[in-house]
Amino acid sequence: MASEVTSAKAVAKTVRIAPRKARIVIDLIRGKQVGEAIAILKYTPRSASPIIEKVLKSAIANAEHNYDLDINNLVVEEAFVDEGPTLKRFRPRAQGRASAINKRTSHITVVVSEVKEG
């Protein structure tokens, strides 16, 4: 008996957005139908929205192309943001000093799964 795949995943690594800011947006789509999730992301005025929308669309495309899943029955099963490598920079300050600036990056993961009707 072959196990049937009912979920697909997409990951964007080392995206130049702070994980804390991306998590605010990713919390909005977790558990939603994919059509509703795309609509939410399209009208959310946050810098993370287009990035997460792109990852979600990639997961949907993976589900359709790789596993022949029905797009109309897909739900965002998992959506999370992990911290990527931090780029460390310095900003010159007064009197010869310098302040550290941490440019944080994120790893964004979205898993969509097919919900069986009935």
Swiss-Prot record:
GO terms for molecular function: rRNA binding; structural constituent of ribosome. This is Large ribosomal subunit protein uL22. InterPro entries: Ribosomal_uL22, Ribosomal_uL22_bac/chlpt-type, Ribosomal_uL22_bac/org-type, Ribosomal_uL22_CS, Ribosomal_uL22_sf. It holds the Pfam family Ribosomal_L22. This protein binds specifically to 23S rRNA; its binding is stimulated by other ribosomal proteins, e.g. L4, L17, and L20. It is important during the early stages of 50S assembly. It makes multiple contacts with different domains of the 23S rRNA in the assembled 50S subunit and ribosome. The globular domain of the protein is located near the polypeptide exit tunnel on the outside of the subunit, while an extended beta-hairpin is found that lines the wall of the exit tunnel in the center of the 70S ribosome. Part of the 50S ribosomal subunit. Keywords: Ribonucleoprotein, Ribosomal protein, RNA-binding, rRNA-binding. It comes from Listeria monocytogenes serovar 1/2a (strain ATCC BAA-679 / EGD-e). One of its GO terms (biological process) is translation. It comes from the Bacteria. The gene is rplV. The keyword Nuclease does not apply. Belongs to the universal ribosomal protein uL22 family. GO terms for cellular component: cytosolic large ribosomal subunit. The lineage of its organism: Bacteria, Bacillati, Bacillota, Bacilli, Bacillales. The keyword Ribonucleoprotein applies.
